[in-house]
C-alpha cells in the first residue's frame, strides 16, 4: 500500500518536470536591441561581458555626450543642407549603441507623423538623416563606477514642412 501511495505522489512530480529550457522571445532588458547580421556592421564590437547596453540617461547628466555637444551636431546638420522636396511633418528617430571606445553601431530608425503614428515620411529624407547620424564622429565614452560601458543614444529629428526644425533630446 505504501508503494502505491508513493507512486501516486511521484507521478505528478515527474510529469511536471521540464526537459527543455524555456527560451524567451523578449530581450534580456527592456529596449535592448540585438545584433542583426543583415543590418549591422560585423566590425562593431561591444565592450565588457554584458550583451546589453545602458540606456541613454545613464550616459550624461548634461545633455548629449558629444564633443561640442548638441550645438555641434546642429552646425554639422546645417552644413549638410538636408531637406525634403515634400512638405512632410513628423519625427525621425535614429537609435544606436555607443561602445566604450566612443564608436557607434547597431543603428535603428523609426519614423512617425506629427500625431506620433508610425509612418514613412520621405524615404530620401530619412535615408539622409540616417546616414548623417551614422557618420557623426565625436561621441564621448562614459563610465559607471569607474568601468567603461556601452550605452544607447538616440537623436530625434523634428520635421516641419520637409525640414529639420529641431533635434531632440
Question: Can you say where each PLM-predicted feature lies in the sequence?
Answer:
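Positively charged n-region of N-terminal signal peptides that target proteins for export
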Residues: 1-4, 18
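Sec-dependent N-terminal signal peptides
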Residues: 4-14
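Charge-biased low-complexity segments
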Residues: 18-169
